[in-house]
Amino acid sequence: MAELVVALDFPAADVAVDMAGRLRGTAPWMKVGLELFCAAGPDVVRAVADLGFRVFLDLKFHDIPNTVRGAVRSAVRSGADMVNIHLMGGERMARAAVEGLHEGAQTTGSVPLLFGVTVLTSTAQGELPGISTDIGEYAASLAASGAAWGLNGVVCSGYEVESIKKRCGASFLCLTPGIRPGGGAGGDDQRRVMTPAQAVSAGSDYLVVGRPVTGAADPAAAARAIMAEMAAVRR
């Protein structure tokens, strides 16, 4: 069954942890991204985890292999249950990330999930410099590489999930941002969006939702409504 990940896209730890506290008993996952992590560091990962959530540390590592290996190792030691890298970093970087994942797990006793970013959901067809391939085909090709390199899954839009599952197998996980209840872009920078029901029907395993939950008058109610929509889909 697909799971909801709420994005804590805030500039300060106190605001993020307060929001996570308001969401206890709803979504099983919280996402800590670049803005929050740069403001608060690893302590915010631990603070959110202490509230009973699993934490997706969304830092999209993309650097030389040794640097990524160390960064992933540190991310795991911070208490993250899921981390990610950019697949465009290539095979050596991806395999180094897998090594860092297992090195970090020697401290924590638990191996997190490692995902590879294919194409950002804020990117539309024709916006990738020097790449004329169909964006869906390009994402599926990157995903197949990620599967071969030992990753657990990929970050992709809902539009690529079916082709990725066909190429990589049903057990290869797909995490989908750009989820918008009602299907609207919401006035933000996401381009390739889906409703929760559409994404679950497409086969997504994790749905990332930020502002439609955290910006709602009642965030817990908004999260529960999305989870109910997800649960109603049979696939």
From Swiss-Prot:
InterPro entries, A to Z: Aldolase_TIM, OMPdecase, OMPdecase_AS, OMPdecase_bac, OMPdeCOase_dom, RibuloseP-bd_barrel
EC numbers: 4.1.1.23
Residues reported in the UniProt entry to bind substrate: 9, 31, 58-67, 121, 180, 190, 210-211
Keywords linked to the UniProt accession: Decarboxylase, Lyase, Pyrimidine biosynthesis
Pathway membership, UniProt: Pyrimidine metabolism; UMP biosynthesis via de novo pathway; UMP from orotate: step 2/2
GO-annotated molecular function: orotidine-5'-phosphate decarboxylase activity
The UniProt record lists the keyword Methyltransferase: no
Keyword hit for Lyase: yes
PROSITE patterns, A to Z: OMPDECASE (PS00156)
Catalytic activity: orotidine 5'-phosphate + H(+) = UMP + CO2
Pfam short name (any one): OMPdecase
Gene (name only): pyrF
Function as written in the Swiss-Prot or TrEMBL entry: Catalyzes the decarboxylation of orotidine 5'-monophosphate (OMP) to uridine 5'-monophosphate (UMP).
Name by which UniProt lists this protein: Orotidine 5'-phosphate decarboxylase
Entries under NCBIfam families matching the protein: PRK00230.1 (NF001273), pyrF (TIGR01740)
Entry's family note: Belongs to the OMP decarboxylase family. Type 1 subfamily.
GO BP, one annotated term: 'de novo' pyrimidine nucleobase biosynthetic process
GO cellular component, one term: cytosol
SUPFAM superfamilies on file: Ribulose-phoshate binding barrel
Residues forming coiled coils: none
SMART domains, A to Z: OMPdecase
Active site residues according to the UniProt entry: 60 (proton donor)
